[in-house]
Amino acid sequence: MNSELFSPYTIKDVTLKNRIVMSPMCMYSSENEDGQVTNFHLVHYGTRAAGQVGLVMIEATAVLPEGRISNKDLGIWDDSLIEGLHKTTTFIHDNGAKAAIQLAHAGRKAELETDALAPSAIPFNETMKTPVEMSKHQIKDTILAFQQAAIRSKQAGFDVIEIHGAHGYLINEFLSPLSNKRTDEYGGSPENRYRFLREIIDSINEVWNGPLFVRISANDYHPDGLTVQDYVQYTKWMKEQGVDLIDCSSGAVVPARIDVYPGYQVQYAKHIKEHANIATGAVGLITTGAQAEQILNNNEADLIFIGRELLRNPYFPRIAANELGFELEEPHQYERAPGKISTNK
């Protein structure tokens, strides 16, 4: 039986064997607080590759030490971190998948002892510290840090880079009028609020020619915040700059009540795909093969990002294939265990 979910997908010169992407999820497991990959990361990501995920995207990886969400985040701010990341991509490639990295800066959500940086001195909520408004020098240094991180990503063997522009972290803070009250060229109009991300994309394009994704929060869930229609213009600009795919998440730039249900963010992937004419990834409570297949068949997205379901079961692709009646080619080491596997959770 044919399946869209298990059909290949090519972006530039990178071909994914199927449409399943492991969504980036922080593991907070750099136990020495030095940003280094540990044995846990090798097993964690290698197992999902062996489980037949098409693209394994490692977690938000900080471009600067002060840009970590926590002290135990992975980092890519120094050349000494390349070796561990290269081991990770080798594990992923050896098990049949492509490897992606999400480059990130936590901004005002950095829970560290040092000052948190943000476009404006506005805390996320009443319990978190008030960040320091970034100077233009700090902005330029951060843009350079993203560029240097892209160089290291290439040296580490990654096939795809994703820029983390969602979930209330630094880039998202610049994009949203709820967190960006600047009066210079980095604040005010949508064009100005986009400038920080524009300059990051330009800087990465100077050193990286592989597939480039951007994760967005397509809805601020606030009456004065951004909606998916605002992101249509942002993503049109991203496409003009050469971004290949928009990973469509939502929320977390300010505290908000969100009506969560299966596939609740698919609408954003569909809207951006249709109105910005750019490839999209759907993410958020996608938990079955049938659900993923329907999203693709309805042309609502091009890739399916799976998060918590892959934490529950690293062999989710096998379960999805069984559900869809698709004969998935197994790793040769597992050929002695043919047939269906349980879908019980």
Swiss-Prot record:
Q: Which GO terms describe its molecular function?
A: FMN binding; NADP binding; NADPH dehydrogenase activity
Q: Which GO terms describe its biological process?
A: response to toxic substance
Q: What is its EC number?
A: 1.6.99.1
Cofactor(s) required for function per UniProt: FMN
Keywords in alphabetical order, please.
Answer: Detoxification, Flavoprotein, FMN, NADP, Oxidoreductase
Q: For binding substrate, which residues are annotated in this chain's numbering?
A: Y28, H164, G165, A166, H167
Q: Which domain of life is it from?
A: Bacteria
Residues that bind FMN, according to the entry? S23, P24, M25, C26, A60, Q102, R215, G307, R308
Q: Name one Pfam family in it.
A: Oxidored_FMN
Listed under catalytic activity are: A + NADPH + H(+) = AH2 + NADP(+)
Q: How does it assemble?
A: Homotetramer.
Write out the function statement from the record. Answer: Catalyzes the reduction of the double bond of an array of alpha,beta-unsaturated aldehydes and ketones. It also reduces the nitro group of nitroester and nitroaromatic compounds. It could have a role in detoxification processes.
Assigned protein family: Belongs to the NADH:flavin oxidoreductase/NADH oxidase family. NamA subfamily.
For this entry, the protein name equals: NADPH dehydrogenase
Originating organism: Bacillus cereus (strain ZK / E33L)
